[in-house]
Amino acid sequence: MKQLMLYCRQGFEKECAGEIQDKATQLEVYGFPRVFKNAGYVLFECYQDGDADKLARELDFNALIFARQMFAVAAEFTELPSEDRISPILAELGEIDAFPVCGDLRIETPDTNEAKELLKFCRKFTVPMRQALRGKGLLLAKENAKKPVFHLCFVASGHCFAGYSYSHNNSRFFMGIPRLKFPADAPSRSTLKLEEAFHVFIPREEWDTRLSSGMWAVDLGACPGGWTYQLVQRSMFVHCVDNGMMADSLMETGQIKHHMVDGFKFEPDRKNVTWLVCDMVEKPARVAHLMGEWLIKGWAKETIFNLKLPMKGRYDEVLQDIENLKTFLIENKVKFKLQAKHLYHDREEITVHIQVLSNISPH
């Protein structure tokens, strides 16, 4: 197996390609990315047979910013007959000894308007395909979350890629996209960005301790309150920092304090803030440095923030800002865990999460 499939946001194929090239090289896997403009995916072509499996196993999926999902490609089918798509797939995969027995099946498409027209077909195709794979011993009789995931990605009605991902090193979401519903009472759609970030960055079993009621949070650039809404829904108390107006529905909860000041000048009077969130429209380097300042001063224990991306050089900007932030924290002897992702609800921006692992007294 020489190909690795990576899903990404349409229009960000170049950034996804640059990232997988860098990450593969770090693992001494050599090859080149095959980029299709606005396709919503990138194919990384490895020179060595078996290297796609190595990447699927060893390349930390959570370390990828622009990829929503990745899987090793075992076979590509370009002219599947509409009357019988299953038989050619089974015949080809039956010849591949290295294909693992899988515990789940996902029949997906890239996230483009053209490809998503195939989703109705994918849903209908799933049941007979699942039965056929089980009959051939390629899929277990019962779903098993510990086994690899079988992926079929259709880019056209007769054109698909078949492969697998490892359950410990993939996105657990169909197409790599969490399915979230916009709350009718939320002040803005930006609320879904923070909700998705919680799903992606924080294990569900840790929500009760890391996103618990009674915590204090700070929201920089809060107006009108899309991100604050998520914190209030979790029964937190929030310092909302913005010169604009907050939604009346949030003010009426009694859980927020509105500070009409510049987010870059605000200092919390309370020293028990757990969460710092920030979605300010500012230069990404400036926002990243501000987040670092808060963390080294012990003003917050965890932060989720967005970095707005420039029109050109987006990948380079991301690398530089994150590297500078890491260096700043390390120089100030802060132990931390950092993750970054181009979320489904992000557009020209990425979302970064940092958890401080050091015990820092606020100062």
From Swiss-Prot:
What is this organism's lineage?
A: Bacteria, Pseudomonadati, Pseudomonadota, Gammaproteobacteria, Vibrionales
Organism whose genome encodes this protein: Vibrio vulnificus (strain CMCP6)
The answer, when asked if Thylakoid is one of the entry's keywords, is: no
Compartments where located: Cytoplasm
Recorded protein name is: Ribosomal RNA large subunit methyltransferase M
Q: Tell me the keywords, alphabetical order.
A: Cytoplasm, Methyltransferase, rRNA processing, S-adenosyl-L-methionine, Transferase
NCBIfam families recorded: PRK11760.1
Query: One Pfam family this chain carries?
Result: RLMM_N
Active site positions, chain numbering: 308
Any idea which GO molecular function terms this record carries?
S-adenosylmethionine-dependent methyltransferase activity
Query: Can you tell me which residues bind S-adenosyl-L-methionine?
Result: 190, 223-226, 242, 262, 279
**Which reaction is the catalytic activity of this chain?**
cytidine(2498) in 23S rRNA + S-adenosyl-L-methionine = 2'-O-methylcytidine(2498) in 23S rRNA + S-adenosyl-L-homocysteine + H(+)
What is this protein's function? Catalyzes the 2'-O-methylation at nucleotide C2498 in 23S rRNA.
Provide the family line: Belongs to the class I-like SAM-binding methyltransferase superfamily. RNA methyltransferase RlmE family. RlmM subfamily.
Give me the Gene Ontology terms describing cellular component. Answer: cytoplasm
Matches recorded under InterPro entries: RlmM_FDX (IPR040739), RlmM_THUMP-like (IPR048646), RNA_MeTrfase_FtsJ_dom (IPR002877), rRNA_MeTrfase_M (IPR011224), SAM-dependent_MTases_sf (IPR029063)
The EC number(s) attached to this protein equal 2.1.1.186
Complex formation: Monomer.
